[in-house]
């Protein structure tokens, strides 16, 4: 691969020379920044185990190298990348893996370093969804995740990725992350703040990332980061874990932000060192116990990760002055919920006791039980999964519910040729059609959607916005 021509401001180079640890070479840093970034993926264990995924793609000739800090993560090299983009493969479309930069898998690895299962988690800056989906997989779709995104244009992408991955325990909000400390004090067991930053670590992906860089802008960004981490710390319950991360390399946006939090709450902040997070972590370990990943260490993007514990309650912030408004959903009564559950099971949709049924007009939704205490405290963009729409003849089951709640053992498995037709939005004509009028169709054991039987034809219900043309399969038909 050809090297990048990266733009480096002189002041940035001087800053990096001063910051570079003695055991690292500045020349190696420059050389690493000029190399194209290695592509990486994370297996979505909500849909497939790592071993089964490796067996599935073995015939494709993909070269997969493990990411040391994420058991589900792999660097990937493919000979057929030009003919079939990675994001257009059937395995990606069905949510079997997420295209995620390797270093961005680090914060979630740190969040779950003690192997505890938090009940309630917040991802403060969640789009496009790589870390939210990674958190959901680590939680096994249990508990609840509040995924917030400040940028309105990115909320839609966040939801699309959550839906593709079959995630059902997430609620989306669209706020400035600085509101949560006051709105939801001491609410979450774990919080990830992957803070907006100057992006000094991403030059391998964007050669012009530093075009607008300046020391002054770093200080301005750090001021916002301090406000964000203060809010997040207020929203964290005592005993909870906060992971702060950035994809930048300067001290002002990294160590100094943590030092500021320590000085503000000296009796309530404990640093949890990350030197044992994975074999080789010591190569990026700072004296404080943080991970400061320069790109030459692991041949990835530059990154910073700190893990903290809140050891005591702190004085609350003033209550927010805004009005949330009336919550637009009502919970289904027991008899109604039983009828919906039975009808869903008849078509192969099943869920556990961690989800509850709610209704808004003619819409039926499944909400994560763990997030119900938050209802009425903040305004949500979306909660859980839309299950169905009511109509005169019963229920119109929604695509996202099929992806999240299908029981594959009760589904109709398509051949590769039939699956390709399905992804193209076309009806399928199997040799032997299923007996029931509505059936979940799968490929590789993974749900693709809900089909209606019309004679010998399976009528396609794949959402129009998801329909794909072109090559979809890496293996031979």
Swiss-Prot record:
Q: Where are the transmembrane segments?
A: none
Residues of the active site are 247 (nucleophile)
- Which PROSITE patterns does UniProt cross-reference here? NOL1_NOP2_SUN (PS01153), SAM_MT_RSMB_NOP (PS51686)
- Give all cystine bridges in this chain: none
Catalytic reaction list: cytidine(1407) in 16S rRNA + S-adenosyl-L-methionine = 5-methylcytidine(1407) in 16S rRNA + S-adenosyl-L-homocysteine + H(+)
**EC supergroup of this enzyme:** transferase
- EC number per UniProt: 2.1.1.178
| Residues the record lists as binding S-adenosyl-L-methionine | 125-131, 149, 176, 194
- Subcellular compartments: Cytoplasm
Q: Which InterPro entries match?
A: Methyltr_RsmF_N, MeTrfase_RsmB-F_NOP2_cat, MeTrfase_RsmB-F_NOP2_dom, Nol1_Nop2_Fmu_2, Nop2p, RCMT, rRNA_ssu_MeTfrase_F, RsmB/NOL1/NOP2-like_CS
Q: Which GO terms describe its cellular component?
A: cytoplasm
UniProt-listed Pfam families = Methyltr_RsmB-F (PF01189), Methyltr_RsmF_N (PF17125), Methyltranf_PUA (PF13636), YebU_pre-PUA_dom (PF21150)
In Gene Ontology terms, what is one molecular function of this protein?
Answer: rRNA (cytosine-C5-)-methyltransferase activity
- UniProt key word Metal-binding: no
From the UniProt annotation, give the residues forming the signal peptide: none
Q: What keywords does the record list, in alphabetical order? A: Cytoplasm, Methyltransferase, RNA-binding, rRNA processing, S-adenosyl-L-methionine, Transferase
Gene Ontology biological-process annotations:
rRNA base methylation
- Family, as annotated: Belongs to the class I-like SAM-binding methyltransferase superfamily. RsmB/NOP family.
Do you know which HAMAP family this protein is assigned to? Answer: 16SrRNA_methyltr_F (MF_01579)
According to its UniProt entry, the function of this protein is described as: Specifically methylates the cytosine at position 1407 (m5C1407) of 16S rRNA.
Output this protein's name.
Ribosomal RNA small subunit methyltransferase F
Origin organism is Klebsiella pneumoniae subsp. pneumoniae (strain ATCC 700721 / MGH 78578)
